[in-house]
Amino acid sequence: MSQAYQPDSTKTSAKTPVAPTVATLNPPKRKTLMRLLAYLKPYWWAILLTIIGFAINAATEIWIAKLLQYITDAINQNDQSKQDLFPFIIVMLFFVRGVGSFLGNYYTALVSRNLVYELRVEVFNKLLRLPSSFYLANPAGTISSKLIFDVEQVTAASTDSMKTLLRDGLTVVALMGFLLYSNWRLTLILFVVLPPILWLIRVASKRYLKLSKGIQETMGDVSHITNEVINGYQVVKNYGGQVYESKRFDVTSKKNLRQGMKVVVTNSINTPAVQLLMAMAMAVVVWLALRPAVIDDISAGQFISYIAAAGLLSKPVRSLTDVNQQLQRGLAAGESIFALLDEPEEADTGVLSPTLAGEIKLDNVSLVYPDSTVALHDFNLDIRAGETVALVGRSGAGKSSLVNLLTRTLTTSSGQITLDGMPIEDIKLESLRAQIAMVNQQVVLFNTTVFNNIAYGSLAHKTPAEVEQAAKDAFAHDFIMQMPNGYQSEIGAEGLQLSGGQRQRLSIARALLKDAPILILDEATSALDNESEYYIQKALDNIMKNRTTLVIAHRLTTIESADRIAVLDGGQIVELGTHTQLMQLHGHYAQMYARDFE
């Protein structure tokens, strides 16, 4: 197998792994709202108490207007007995009003915070079930923005808007009922301005929705840039990227600022316009009410009460106008959240949960990425159980793609992969991944203790003795015991308090503790100093015993002892054999090996 051949282009059009993106078709606005309201069903009792509370609050608005009538008439009639009661009535009225406000505000907040909790947990759990291709297609900052920013905006649509609609909506209904009861002819004039108000709200709604989507997109960009700078702070500092990153962040933040100011302008025009219409209607009502034909039929108290009730309409109407902006912003965020929740999850077609021996066979396997890049083409390789096979080749040769296929992070475009004779797609994902341990160049550690990082996830049931033995086999025990609290020491975010070699040894200890029949070492010793590499190589020798091992390496001196070495180029194996055999071929491997010593 010493000759390379060109991939047959007719075979690369097979099933292509498609990376899902967040940018899917947005559902209709009404559908989004109904879906949001469905989250409120379990809290119907709290919403009922909210309605009762705000209904009490609305009733007190009527009594405030009515009280003005009684006070005015009592003064005109010089009725001292009634006047002595008014201070007590005022105190009781505002006490009842306070009880109603408390019920409404408290239970609205209860629904709101629980909704944030439920949505956030649902989105986070959804992220755990999405395929790797989703993360390749969407920046981390955009994803985290959905979890943090969009969820809060959705809550505003579902609960804060509900609070305003109930509180001020009930107040408007109560006051309009009182006005109709007091003088229905005058009150009908107020309804004349209703059509233009509704038209203004409709126009503003479309504007708010469009701008809210723009704000969300720019917030995702802001979060993405921030994540990049935080994660790559060393590169930013070492290469003097502060000015560039500052300008990039400034441009994105200004986009967000402009979108936000457009919302302010829209709201600043819409709200006064609605208020002006209401004021015009009120002016007509007051003018007519002062006509002799009208005012002669009512007392001064009734007149004051009617005008006061009409004046009290202004604030709730303004609030109902303002809530439209909040509602549209929340609906835009809801569309974004639901688009993510509707993303197809990682497909698990498996039905088998076997205990694997570690035999791997790849038969005419091809992998084509969505951008038509051919990663593997008619790839064939048989690996015996317990055998160590090293994969070498230049960047882009297909080494990492092959590993992703074995863990089903990606799926084949064509061909077949079998483990112990079983098609890989017939094995349950949980069972498959439980029997594959990986040690990567980019070590992933979590902001918790050393113990929890080694006994991570499904390994949490392991005993302290088992964890300690794994650490000893990984040559990590000694430096762990030198830490302030030993295995219970916190290692900081991403384990940055540890050296590269120490972090790698913890990763190896985790793989040892997993005790899986198949081991994948992906550039596990690159970018390390000689002492760290010495200990890690000894640890790797321990972990590779009696396991099927795939080793991806750039430095060929680390894989000379492999049972076989596969040289990849253009997504195919161009040479296969032991180190000695490949050196005798004087082909690709020999040339790469010679370059290692130049």
UniProtKB/Swiss-Prot annotation:
Polar residues bias spans: 1-15
Record-annotated ABC transporter domain positions: 360-595
Protein origin, superkingdom: Bacteria
Transmembrane helix recorded as keyword: yes
Chain segments annotated as transmembrane: 44-64, 85-105, 172-192, 269-289
Signal sequence segment: none
Residues engaged in binding ATP: G393, R394, S395, G396, A397, G398, K399, S400
E.C. number: 7.5.2.6
Chief place where the protein resides: membrane
Subcellular location: Cell inner membrane
Keyword annotations: ATP-binding, Cell inner membrane, Cell membrane, Lipid transport, Membrane, Nucleotide-binding, Translocase, Transmembrane, Transmembrane helix, Transport
Catalytic activity, reaction form: ATP + H2O + lipid A-core oligosaccharideSide 1 = ADP + phosphate + lipid A-core oligosaccharideSide 2
Pfam families named in the record: ABC_membrane, ABC_tran
GO cellular component, one term: plasma membrane
Gene3D superfamilies xref list: ABC transporter type 1, transmembrane domain, P-loop containing nucleotide triphosphate hydrolases
InterPro entries found in the cross-reference section: AAA+_ATPase, ABC1_TM_dom, ABC1_TM_sf, ABC_transporter-like_ATP-bd, ABC_transporter-like_CS, ABC_transpr_lipidA, P-loop_NTPase, Type_1_exporter
UniProt keyword annotation of Transmembrane present: yes
Physiological role: Involved in lipopolysaccharide (LPS) biosynthesis. Translocates lipid A-core from the inner to the outer leaflet of the inner membrane. Transmembrane domains (TMD) form a pore in the inner membrane and the ATP-binding domain (NBD) is responsible for energy generation.
Quaternary structure, from the entry: Homodimer.
Protein name per UniProt: ATP-dependent lipid A-core flippase
Organism expressing this protein natively: Psychrobacter cryohalolentis (strain ATCC BAA-1226 / DSM 17306 / VKM B-2378 / K5)
High-level lineage: Bacteria, Pseudomonadati, Pseudomonadota, Gammaproteobacteria, Moraxellales
Gene behind this protein: msbA
